[in-house]
Amino acid sequence: MTAVDLEFDQLNSTVDALRRSISNRMMYGVGKDAVTARPHDWLHAAALAVRDRLVARWMKTTRLQYEQDVKRVYYLSMEFLIGRTFTNALLALGIYEPMREALAGLGVDMEALIEMEPDAALGNGGLGRLAACFLDSMATLGIPGFGYGIRYEYGMFRQQIVNGEQVEAPDYWLRAGNPWEFPRSEIQYLVHFGGRTVQRGDYVEWIDTQHVNAMAYDTVIPGYATSATNTLRLWSARASEELDLSAFNRGDYRSAVDAKTMSENVSRLLYPDDSTPAGRELRLRQEYFFVSATMQDLIRRYQRTHSTFGRFAEKVAVHLNDTHPVLAIPELMRLLIDVHHVPWDKAWGQIQQMFSYTNHTLMPEALETWDVETLARLLPRHLEIIFEINAQFLKHVSEQSGHDAEMIRRISLVDEYGQRRVRMAYLAIVASQKVNGVSKLHSQLMTRDIFADFARIYPERFTNVTNGITPRRWLAQASPSLSSLIDEQIGTHWRRDLFELERLRELRNDSAFVDAFREAKRQNKLRLAHHLAHHTKISFDPNALFDLQVKRIHEYKRQLLNVLHVIVRYNQIRANPERDWVPRVVMFAGKAASAYRMAKTIIKLIGDVSEKVNHDPLIGDRLKVVFVPNYGVSVAELIIPAADLSEQISMAGTEASGTGNMKLALNGALTIGTMDGANIEICDAVGRENIFIFGHTADEVDSLRAAGYRPRQVYEENPELRMALDQIRTGFFSPDDPLRFSDIFHTLVDWGDHYMVLADFAAFAEAQKEVDERFRTPRAWTESAIENVAGMGQFSSDRTIGEYAREIWHVKSLDMS
């Protein structure tokens, strides 16, 4: 291999240079000229021209990382919801306007190209978007690191709304290719499944396995206004045997490719339906596939500059984004003790210094577990390692706790009640040097409730790092009108230091600024109204209050509470049409998991309510209900900047943090919410007078439950609520199928109302009256909106990553000089 430095053209980014680069890439990269090029070809050529400018930074960053022998962060996540890359890269490089001019000079509309780029379908919701924000901030701060995940061929699904119901279609986002990625066919690792184990002296050999190849695909993650970059490395499954030639020659063409198809299914689809045994097994195979390849890859990278594992923990930090990647722990142990023959105690000691784990849920039923039988069949060696870790852990705790048998059962990594299951979150805690929650309340409840025993055993391990979002995408990119206004007033440095937004507080009494702020918001509302009129055929007044609840459809997020208020408001308007109502457009967006029947029923209820409300001539423009289909990053960039009101109404104690609340507040939406997750910290940051708080607190929820909560009593005592629920029960919104929503009624009224929808309804309705009153005074509303933007400094993912780097990973920024 040559060590000679390559000579290459240093690309500048003038309009002429960009135009020439696009032309070259069209000719030599796409293989077309201007006569035959189609719009997607122009997008591909422009993307390659931008990618070329990132690569030199990428190479420099990689070389400096090796020269400085830095500690690297390996961020493992099943999801990376990165959205579109083109605009983000232009803003990071500072070449948005030059690129627009360059394309215009070639007769191409850049805005049309931007709309053609598909979202990378590598995630579903907040978990994946958080991971993407973190990669952006790591690169911007110069934190050396890699994101690792799976290169799904299909996303979770493309959501269509047909007759008010969710219909799932394949999301083949790679149909036109992906110009941003670099296939690395030379970087492949064997990933094993099944087989059996054999003791070979002082180590164990795993034999008779089936295997699949994991091939790397790399994408450059640019930092903003810096030459530092990082890498997102995604694994794609490749069959170790492409074709059974003997079967093919016999004419058995299907059998000839069966093994290849089965192998490559591992990276085919994000979150296969796990309501069947086959779906659950595929999910487990996915999780192990990506962590096995990742652990092999980080060992290879470490060994390039180190001959022993003595400094392994000094140079490697592995972060687990939720429990999906927890199998990385036994896999790294297996590689160290069985392949590299590191003694158990030394290997385990290194692992406990390297790993950290972020918990994202307070609901015990959402903590991932795997049954012992399946693990024994698919990953027999890993189960042995988990059993040994558990035995040593329980022995240590038993000696310290005076042999408390009940506690030992509670904290065992293996749940022995009923079907034996391995508790993945517990394994992560035992192996990690730090475990963090993602908001102050979440971290408190995590150590008080679901992990209370572990918090007593390892008090020093538990900490809080409140989530954050990247302001580059969620304000600079998503809302050009508002970000341009802010630039005019305080400059552009807020993109790197979000606390700069505090200076906007000085302008809340400046009439010219308040008017300009309101106009920027109005432009965003017009943009969204135009989009929805085209895509949903629903038109509405852009001067109405835009009321948004955009998030995964789940009972704990309480879209039902919002729907009930919509129905009550609808009934009130019909009863009093002459009253001066504040016009309101209530928008929902989000996907329901394909196997989650209740969530899909909630979507159908929203659809049926929308159909009734939007076609009632007595209602007119005073109330509209819209479900925006296929919610993802690009849809969010369109819808979030237009919001007036942000619905963050989960039952207190259920939402770990939330990041949609931060994105909406950053764009000047006022929050209506419970004291849950990061809402509490947003309330502190923007002032109680600039947010609408309602409902039971987490402690009050516990007290109400302990006292014997009776939702039917609430139903009977509130006439407006009772009428709305009866309309749901009797088919008022579903005359074609009157019993369609009977389960919703019974869940809320007769089956315990687990998420306290009815308990919080009266307080929610009162808070909505406050919303109406504030919105009637545009000046007061806009001043509160300005306060929300100004208070968002602490919710930048740059702050979050800075805390991770200092407190958890113990890693320093790369010296780019």
Predicted regions, residues:
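A conserved ligand/cofactor-binding region detector
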Residues: 1-817
